[in-house]
Amino acid sequence: MKQIYRVDKSGNLAQAISEITAPKLLLLMSNNEQFEQHVEELERHFPGVPSIGCIGGSYGGQTVVADNGVAVIAMEGNLSVVTNVLEQASTMPVKYIGRLEEDINKVAASENNTICIDFCSGNDACVLTTIYSVLGKKHISLVGGTGDGGKVSVNGKIYADADAYALIRNNDGKIKVYKENIYKQVPACRFIASKTDRSKYLIGELNGRPARKVYQDILNIGDKEMATQTFKNPLGKMNGQDICIISIKEVVGDKLECYRQVNDSDVL
């Protein structure tokens, strides 16, 4: 199998996909302004090719394109692919778990030759629990992320409050996903979250103090610098032996709005 990654910093999808010729799966990461346009355009260029998409940053070399870029990942080769969606992500994604179970059977998925990639619109903790209830039985690896804007796409159709997923089976050999934490922990900085709002992804306090003030004191920065920290200095949530990156989206008063949910008593 072969993976192709292409990005256009100006949001020109035609340019980004110009070298893609025989995709078996397409992953779209667009910007908020052009997402619907890009979803339609991608389906028009590659009708019938399975695809999933979300709103998110696109990376070109060392440059992060967060506002108006577009990125596409194409997977080629002897692959069996099925894409689908779990709806009602914020309330009852388990209602649609039968779709995932059926799709696993469609591709004859197994631990060594199949992975799952997902793009979620939100409430990822609940969605992941739902997905793992199925994937865990077959030890199928999962990789993905939560996009912005509360919507995702599957095969040219846009869904709000949903999780888009793709099951990929490599018919020529094995396939596996890996993760890498590119951040280093700041020494002696561990906090207990409180006064959180799970529905709005807000952290009110860290160790009993206003979250904004604590964050600024650690980094010795002011209000103006807060907006530049999303990719530089994220918080990390302890999840067993793993650290889950929780990037800060924006400051809301003395609270921090994040890209992932944080609960009271979570260790950061």
What function would you assign to each model-found segment?
Residues 1-45, 49, 54-268:
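Small-residue-enriched flexible segments
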